[in-house]
A protein has these predicted regions:
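Short, positively charged, Gly/Tyr-enriched micro-motifs
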Residues: 59-115
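Intrinsically disordered, low-complexity segments enriched in small/polar residues
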Residues: 3, 11, 26, 51-55, ...
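Generic detector of short, locally flexible boundary/turn motifs and exposed helical patches
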Residues: 1, 9, 43-48, 55, ...
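Intrinsic disorder/low-structure terminal segments
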Residues: 5, 17, 53, 62, ...
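N-terminal juxtadomain amphipathic helix
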Residues: 31-80
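Residue-identity detector for threonine
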Residues: 3, 21, 26, 30, ...
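Short helix-coil boundary/hinge micro-motifs
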Residues: 1-41
């Protein structure tokens, strides 16, 4: 996991599910790349799941920082159910219901649940 202070800019709770893999800065913006950790979703712990990569990145605009636009580039993980052959994902609505979260984290989950 990349740790260079950028984790302080993320909504509280994000690093429970994601790790920072890269940060890119240009003159006008900062992009923080987040990859979902290989933690089996709670609702699927009784199944035999195997990580099968990621969906296409989703891009969420976060609050500006010192005049720069901040983007969170999110890679969502997918798992294969070895018994059924189904692909499963983490259901962010369930994460939201099961956690005490800050308004920032709630906004983040709302942004990524569209993808």
């Amino acid at each position: 996991m990349l740790t260079s202070g950028f984790e302080l800019l993320l909504p509280e709770g994000v690093l429970d599910y994601f790790e920072i893999t890269n940060v890119e800065q240009t003159k006008g913006d900062t992009s923080i790349y987040l990859q979902e950790k290989n933690i089996i979703p709670e609702e699927y712990t009784d199944r035999r799941l195997e990580s099968k990569g990621f969906y296409e990145d989703s891009k969420v605009q976060d609050f500006p920082l010192r005049g720069r636009v901040v983007y969170l580039i999110v890679r969502h993980r997918r798992w294969l159910d070895k018994d059924t052959g189904d692909i499963v994902i983490r259901h962010w609505e369930l994460v939201a219901k099961g956690t005490r979260m800050t308004q920032e984290f709630a906004t983040f989950l709302k942004g990524i649940s569209r993808y």
